[in-house]
């Protein structure tokens, strides 16, 4: 993880750690002139590592975004941001996207009253995301919500009720709330 962060910069979904300022100096010395290919590859890798996608998953999302009307880049980011694992991360129910994936895989999360164990589940507006009624599930989410540093900067397309361990997707995400800097 730390090699990826040093190479690509801060990836908030992958880990909460930040690259040290000294590593930037090292990158500038060996970088030289950046070709268009290198810039595109780095941006693609940022997307992959931030959202925890495989190459094939990313290609599927690019294909879906290309077919839809509108800007392909904006639609791609909207598709990625509406994934269940990412919404849990944005709500503060998990500290990282891999942590949110684990919560979903271990069947701690309900969407509209049904257990969903697929992290790539695409959430829709008016979806209600809650925890299982088990004490262990609630304790896990409570720890994450209590230690969540970005509770006050919740995106406007999401609302959370921390006492009932419930999140609500109000609408499709607006592009200005995406925390990743992509060129």
Swiss-Prot record:
<dbReference type="InterPro" id="IPR036986">
    <property type="entry name" value="S4_RNA-bd_sf"/>
</dbReference>
<dbReference type="GO" id="GO:0019843">
    <property type="term" value="F:rRNA binding"/>
</dbReference>
<dbReference type="Pfam" id="PF01479">
    <property type="entry name" value="S4"/>
</dbReference>
<dbReference type="InterPro" id="IPR001912">
    <property type="entry name" value="Ribosomal_uS4_N"/>
</dbReference>
<comment type="similarity">
    <text>Belongs to the universal ribosomal protein uS4 family.</text>
</comment>
<keyword id="KW-0699">rRNA-binding</keyword>
<comment type="function">
    <text>One of the primary rRNA binding proteins, it binds directly to 16S rRNA where it nucleates assembly of the body of the 30S subunit.</text>
</comment>
<dbReference type="InterPro" id="IPR018079">
    <property type="entry name" value="Ribosomal_uS4_CS"/>
</dbReference>
<dbReference type="GO" id="GO:0006412">
    <property type="term" value="P:translation"/>
</dbReference>
<protein>
    <recommendedName>
        <fullName>Small ribosomal subunit protein uS4c</fullName>
    </recommendedName>
</protein>
<keyword id="KW-0689">Ribosomal protein</keyword>
<comment type="subunit">
    <text>Part of the 30S ribosomal subunit. Contacts protein S5. The interaction surface between S4 and S5 is involved in control of translational fidelity.</text>
</comment>
<dbReference type="InterPro" id="IPR002942">
    <property type="entry name" value="S4_RNA-bd"/>
</dbReference>
<dbReference type="InterPro" id="IPR005709">
    <property type="entry name" value="Ribosomal_uS4_bac-type"/>
</dbReference>
<feature type="domain" description="S4 RNA-binding">
    <location>
        <begin position="82"/>
        <end position="143"/>
    </location>
</feature>
<dbReference type="InterPro" id="IPR022801">
    <property type="entry name" value="Ribosomal_uS4"/>
</dbReference>
<dbReference type="GO" id="GO:0015935">
    <property type="term" value="C:small ribosomal subunit"/>
</dbReference>
<dbReference type="GO" id="GO:0009507">
    <property type="term" value="C:chloroplast"/>
</dbReference>
<dbReference type="GO" id="GO:0003735">
    <property type="term" value="F:structural constituent of ribosome"/>
</dbReference>
<comment type="function">
    <text>With S5 and S12 plays an important role in translational accuracy.</text>
</comment>
<keyword id="KW-0687">Ribonucleoprotein</keyword>
<dbReference type="GO" id="GO:0042274">
    <property type="term" value="P:ribosomal small subunit biogenesis"/>
</dbReference>
<keyword id="KW-0934">Plastid</keyword>
<keyword id="KW-0694">RNA-binding</keyword>
<keyword id="KW-0150">Chloroplast</keyword>
<dbReference type="Pfam" id="PF00163">
    <property type="entry name" value="Ribosomal_S4"/>
</dbReference>
């Amino acid at each position: 993880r730390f090699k990826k962060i040093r190479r690509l910069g801060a990836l908030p979904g992958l880990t909460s750690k930040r690259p040290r300022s000294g590593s930037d100096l090292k990158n500038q010395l060996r970088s030289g002139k950046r070709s268009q290919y290198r810039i595109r590859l780095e941006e693609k890798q940022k997307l992959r590592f931030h959202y925890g996608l495989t190459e094939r998953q990313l290609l599927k999302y690019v294909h879906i975004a290309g077919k839809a009307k509108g800007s392909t880049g904006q639609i791609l980011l909207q598709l990625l941001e509406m994934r269940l694992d990412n919404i849990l991360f944005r709500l503060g129910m998990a500290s990282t996207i891999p942590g949110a994936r684990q919560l979903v895989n271990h069947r701690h999360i309900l969407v509209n009253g049904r257990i969903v164990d697929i992290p790539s589940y695409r959430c829709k507006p008016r979806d209600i995301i809650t925890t299982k009624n088990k004490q262990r599930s609630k304790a896990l989410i409570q720890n994450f919500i209590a230690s969540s540093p970005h509770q006050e900067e919740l995106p406007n397309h999401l609302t959370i009720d921390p006492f009932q361990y419930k999140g609500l997707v109000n609408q499709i995400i607006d592009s200005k709330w995406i925390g990743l800097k992509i060129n």
